[in-house]
Amino acid sequence: MISYENKEIEIKGCPGCAYAKHQFDVPCGIAYENERFILSQDWEVPILGFFIVSPKKHIEKLEELTKNERDEMFDIVDKTIKILRENNICDRFDIIFEEREDKHSHVWIIPRYAWMNEICDRIIKNIGTILDYAKKNFRTRDVYEQINQITKIVKKNFASKKYKKLIKINMFCKF
């Protein structure tokens, strides 16, 4: 079960797989999609510019993607951040690859806003607090309209010639 604007959407099985197969409408729209990935704003957490890059195939661990798929996924992350910066949506971001057992893994692109620092001093350490705060305080028609506008901006830019060719980058850390 997921929620959006206080509405419940029932999902049977893996929400990530249902999302990838278009078994339900993505409330905030899809900003970018290709054969392997979908990019959209997180409709459950109404933070402006909070995007999810989700593989269409079900994976639980990063290493289940090929090197080319990982490169492509992080190219999408890179392009999304550039578009958000160029359109003055946000200037700082945290990137999290959420890898959980029995879940459809995906990348979170989390914008950094001043209000987050007011809630807690270490954003990554307290990400749950930030997400819960957004769920409790930002589920308004106005915020969802802004989220839809940002999705349209990102979608338009992904379609432009400037972003047609994926920029090859290497954002992997050695652990």
Model-derived regions, located:
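HIT superfamily nucleotide-processing domains
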Residues: 1-175
